[in-house]
Amino acid sequence: MIVVLVDPRRPTLVPVEAIEFLRGEVQYTEEMPVAVPWSLPAARSAHAGNDAPVLLSSDPNHPAVITRLAAGARLISAPDSQRGERLVDAVAMMDKLRTAGPWESEQTHDSLRRYLLEETYELLDAVRSGSVDQLREELGDLLLQVLFHARIAEDASQSPFTIDDVADTLMRKLGNRAPGVLAGESISLEDQLAQWEAAKASEKARKSVADDVHTGQPALALAQKVIQRAQKAGLPAHLIPDEITSVSVSADVDAENTLRTAVLDFIDRLRCAERAIAVARRGSNVAEQLDVTPLGVITEQEWLAHWPTAVNDSRGGSKKRKGMR
């Protein structure tokens, strides 16, 4: 006698070694889908008649399965679950919620923004707490947001994409940015970081050091990111204004909005300087739309010569902006 156990999530997929045995007389347990009797003409219910040579089931705890295995029946089972299979279940569950849930079906990318922000902060709290249980739960909540947004994108009338497209984009990015590690090469930390940054720069093809800086993030994180980009681009330190490097907090001042305004103004200055440097490099006889040469490395002298405003500091006070914005 033989017991064939299939994966309950994919009950119509059977192990290849079981195929020859399913051509004859087969019984199946009641949880199996109707596709079983349709596909196997000789199949009948496990409760009908005498025991057939083969029992097909997706339930390892079914009484008929337990009885036959206890009597010495041979077991042919589906391969063990692979890591990540529960993600497939989560995708299917999200699809069901999106199509059948009254609340889920009405949500948009914009309506979910506050939940995404809340879950991100809750995950950060979980990391800080050191609680493994809390961390696992909050990672799941953040994963829900990823699945939800991907499922909403699938319904878009223009440029729809699926969760598989999201995963494919991620895999392509990782494959491009960490080729050495993924190829099994022995690589130093410095070389890995260099590969990553080089690939990232090639992908983004930024025209400005401020490109791809997401201004919707908290003002302090925004300031840190912009300062980091500016320093990497060789901007002299004294051109970074005090109002974004030193934050003052008081009860009667909106510190978040004040800092954000200062950072956005600094971004404007960066872009103005970059445009002026580009004009100076290409000359007045070349139209801007014909100039596709990336700025590349900007020297300290270029930053200083084309910076659109002076910086408040204790040494020289402040000067007015040149009028560029």
UniProtKB/Swiss-Prot annotation:
Biophysicochemical property: pH dependence: Optimum pH is 9.6.
EC number(s) given by UniProt: 3.6.1.8
GO CC entries: peptidoglycan-based cell wall
Keyword terms, alphabetized: ATP-binding, Hydrolase, Magnesium, Metal-binding, Nucleotide-binding
Molecular-function annotations in GO: 8-oxo-7,8-dihydrodeoxyguanosine triphosphate pyrophosphatase activity; ATP binding; ATP diphosphatase activity; magnesium ion binding; nucleoside triphosphate diphosphatase activity
Temperature-related activity annotation: Optimum temperature is 37 degrees Celsius. The activity is abolished at 70 degrees Celsius.
NCBIfam families per record: PRK12334.1-1
SUPFAM superfamilies the UniProt entry points to: all-alpha NTP pyrophosphatases
Catalytic activity: ATP + H2O = AMP + diphosphate + H(+)
Highest taxon listed in the record's lineage: Bacteria
Protein name (Swiss-Prot/TrEMBL): Nucleoside triphosphate pyrophosphohydrolase
Gene source species: Mycobacterium tuberculosis (strain ATCC 25618 / H37Rv)
Motif placement: Important for catalytic activity: 219
Membership in a protein family: Belongs to the nucleoside triphosphate pyrophosphohydrolase family.
Function field: Required to maintain the full capacity of the mycobacterium to respond to oxidative stress via the degradation of oxidation-induced damaged nucleotides. Hydrolyzes all canonical (d)NTPs, as well as mutagenic dUTP and 8-oxo-7,8-dihydro-2'-deoxyguanosine 5'-triphosphate (8-oxo-dGTP). Also involved in the transcriptional activation of RelA in response to oxidative stress.
A biological-process GO annotation: dUTP catabolic process
Subunit-level organization: Homotetramer.
Cofactor or coenzyme needed: Mg(2+)
Induction (record text): By oxidative stress.
UniProt enzyme class: hydrolase
Pfam families linked to this entry: MazG (PF03819)
